[in-house]
Amino acid sequence: MLNHIPHLLTPELVKALCEMGHSDTIVLADANFPGAMIARAQGALLLRADGHGVPELLDAILELMPLDTYVDQPVRMMEKMPCDRELEIPVLETYKRIVAHYDPRGAAAIGAYERFAFYEEAKKAFCIVQTGETAVYANLILQKGVIQADPGLKARYLQY
């Protein structure tokens, strides 16, 4: 048992987040995403989170993992297909609020890839987390940033 680890994050997912390096990516995939096929073809790690949606996992992951500050948009969604031009994507507003809570760039940190470009980027991911999310166009790719040193940590060590 550990303190301050969101309960949604499995030990395997926490391990994957720890093993990821700067600029590595993780896919938070909805229930319809071909995660198993992509992971199998690329040798990527596939983790299951069937009982959870993408928004709650996004919130839990960003509590631990910083977003990359060396790129303008470290969070990427899948663009709507032309046939879905008129389709509302309400989960986007949820993502904007969650990202803004953890990153000062807010909604500006969120970009999009065309559908097939998204699949190509997903093939490069360190890890794919397949969720039970049923919202349309709910897939995300997150790019990991760097952990900043805690200046108070050394001071605490010196007290002992």
Can you say where each PLM-predicted feature lies in the sequence?
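Long, hydrophobic N-terminal alpha-helical segment
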Residues: 1-50
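Generic structural signal for well-ordered, non-membrane alpha-helical segments
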Residues: 6, 10, 50-54, 58, ...
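Structural motif
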Residues: 24-27, 43-46, 68-77, 106-109, ...
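Short, solvent-exposed amphipathic alpha-helical segments in soluble enzyme
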Residues: 32, 37, 42-44, 62, ...
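Gly/Ser/Thr-rich active-site loops/lids in small-molecule metabolic enzymes
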Residues: 44-61, 153
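Short C-terminal domain-edge/linker segments immediately following a structured domain
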Residues: 56-62, 77-80, 157-160
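Glycine-rich, aromatic-bearing surface loops/beta-hairpins
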Residues: 82-160
